[in-house]
Amino acid sequence: MDYTKQPILFKIRKAARYVRLYGVRRTLVKVKGQYHSTRTFATLPAERAERTGRHVGILGCGNFAFSHIAYYLRKNYGSVIRGVMDPSIHKAASLFEEYDADDYTTDAKRIIDDPQIDLVFIASNHASHAEYAVDALAAGKSVHIEKPHVVRYDQLERLCDAMTRSPGRVTLGFNRPNSAIGREIRKQLWSQSGSSMFNWFIAGHAIAPDHWYYKPEEGGRVLGNLCHWTDFVLQLVPPEARYPITVTPTRAEKSDCDIAVTYVFGDGSIAAITFSAKGHTFEGVRERFAAHRGNVLISMDDFKDLVVENLDRKQRISQLFRDHGHQEAIRASYALVRPRDGKLNEGVTREYVWQTGDLFLRTKDALEQNRVLVIESGEPPTSGGGGGGGGGG
């Protein structure tokens, strides 16, 4: 839904609701982000002379880059953005102007080859994420790759291979596990032993059939949306207990929304993810999570309210605003190149990049083929080896 074209009363109600959910500053930048996406310039702004302290590049200047990546970079570190790129020169110019960057362009190579840039945030169209990441790693840059980091197995293999060859480090844009509530969920569940039960219900926006997500090369909504929750459940299962993973789809006409998927992990843990997209959700994506391991029962709503029960103890955590972990994700990525609390972030491992990508790619296969699939192992292939993640069932 294009909020800029809605009646004024709708806009007022939407903004007022978001102030309650996110606070005034976050709501303001979200509103600006909506207008940024459609802004055009009669005369493009002049580029600025090179200035010291600006060392970050952004590839893709859509709403997410504007209202999350650039916003949290400036909030935490000031004016550190050196150059930005988008296929739309107007979006690039808008982000450049709002966040006081030095350079804007439609040429990704100009950002990747800039010697002043040592960290690249990739938030472009999904099919380009891995391609830009491989090029940036080859140029010695560290990279933050927004989800999904790949849309095909050949990209996953090339990305993992590039990680072994580059001095650059990598982070992925799966923000939820590192939110305050996400960290608390994992801490509480990992205080117990044995297998777990996880249940996600997600209500997302319906999007038009001609939306760019649905272009064959972009991977659809499993890779564009569902990967957030496949990654979350993967990270809740201890690495040594994950494999094999049995993926069972439940679907009707569609293969990437109004669907459910269940996973049985190697230790007997079971996860169910239900993704509904039937209309407009006024408060944004809605999420409800429940889990049980040992004596711990978890219930969570919208990364705002969490209830933890352990035998006779009951703990309620209610945050003032929703926090999906975006700020923490940006701060962790910035620490790839600038120390945080005295040390650099080493980034994610090649094994994790493979495993979370393999899981959402196999989930997409299972839903499209409407059959059970088994992922036998989480071991990345050797350089030049074949992919595919596992056999069918």
Which stretches of residues belong to each language-model region?
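A contiguous active-site-proximal alpha/beta segment in oxidoreductase catalytic domains
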Residues: 150-209
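NAD(P)-binding Rossmann-fold cofactor-contacting core
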Residues: 77-96
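Beta-loop-alpha module in the N-terminal Rossmann-like domain of NAD(P)-dependent dehydrogenases
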Residues: 99-144, 148-162
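Rossmann-like dinucleotide-binding domain that binds NAD(P)(H)
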Residues: 209-286
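Hydrophobic residues in well-ordered beta-strands that form the structural core
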Residues: 145-146, 170-172, 300
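Glycine-rich adenosine-cofactor-binding loop
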Residues: 52-68
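NAD(P)-dinucleotide binding in Rossmann-like oxidoreductases
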Residues: 269-334
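C-terminal helix-rich "cap/oligomerization" subdomain common to oxidoreductases
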Residues: 1-49, 119, 335-393
